[in-house]
Amino acid sequence: MEFSVESLETPALTKAHLAELLFEQIGLNKRESKEMIDAFFELISDRLVEGKDVKISGFGNFQIRTKAPRPGRNPRTGEAIPIESRRVVTFHASHKLKEQIQGSALLGLKTANIFAEDNGPVT
């Protein structure tokens, strides 16, 4: 399944875009597509709220991390304010995704270099 970001109205991929892709490329009706996308993200959210990791092969891992309490400071007044401990979600991209991102970045760099050689420096 392949699509380009250029075909999107905004460069961000949204749940609505994902549902539209299921509708167009898999053949689900629009209601089923939306329900499937919503169920997918609800499942991920539920696991994270439970404090469990979410591992998506070839994409990456979502993990819950507890940040320790620490001293903070109000930037306007300089007053010391304690920051309480909290849970945060972290994402670590898989090696495969990192390689794909680096490959596309290198491809873009090579293209820019080709244009720079033909037309002078790229500014």
From Swiss-Prot:
<dbReference type="GO" id="GO:0005829">
    <property type="term" value="C:cytosol"/>
</dbReference>
<protein>
    <recommendedName>
        <fullName>Integration host factor subunit alpha</fullName>
    </recommendedName>
</protein>
<keyword id="KW-0805">Transcription regulation</keyword>
<keyword id="KW-0804">Transcription</keyword>
<comment type="similarity">
    <text>Belongs to the bacterial histone-like protein family.</text>
</comment>
<dbReference type="GO" id="GO:0006417">
    <property type="term" value="P:regulation of translation"/>
</dbReference>
<dbReference type="InterPro" id="IPR020816">
    <property type="entry name" value="Histone-like_DNA-bd_CS"/>
</dbReference>
<dbReference type="InterPro" id="IPR005684">
    <property type="entry name" value="IHF_alpha"/>
</dbReference>
<dbReference type="InterPro" id="IPR000119">
    <property type="entry name" value="Hist_DNA-bd"/>
</dbReference>
<comment type="function">
    <text>This protein is one of the two subunits of integration host factor, a specific DNA-binding protein that functions in genetic recombination as well as in transcriptional and translational control.</text>
</comment>
<dbReference type="GO" id="GO:0006310">
    <property type="term" value="P:DNA recombination"/>
</dbReference>
<dbReference type="Pfam" id="PF00216">
    <property type="entry name" value="Bac_DNA_binding"/>
</dbReference>
<keyword id="KW-0810">Translation regulation</keyword>
<dbReference type="GO" id="GO:0030527">
    <property type="term" value="F:structural constituent of chromatin"/>
</dbReference>
<dbReference type="GO" id="GO:0003677">
    <property type="term" value="F:DNA binding"/>
</dbReference>
<dbReference type="InterPro" id="IPR010992">
    <property type="entry name" value="IHF-like_DNA-bd_dom_sf"/>
</dbReference>
<keyword id="KW-0238">DNA-binding</keyword>
<comment type="subunit">
    <text>Heterodimer of an alpha and a beta chain.</text>
</comment>
<dbReference type="GO" id="GO:0009893">
    <property type="term" value="P:positive regulation of metabolic process"/>
</dbReference>
<keyword id="KW-0233">DNA recombination</keyword>
<dbReference type="GO" id="GO:0006355">
    <property type="term" value="P:regulation of DNA-templated transcription"/>
</dbReference>
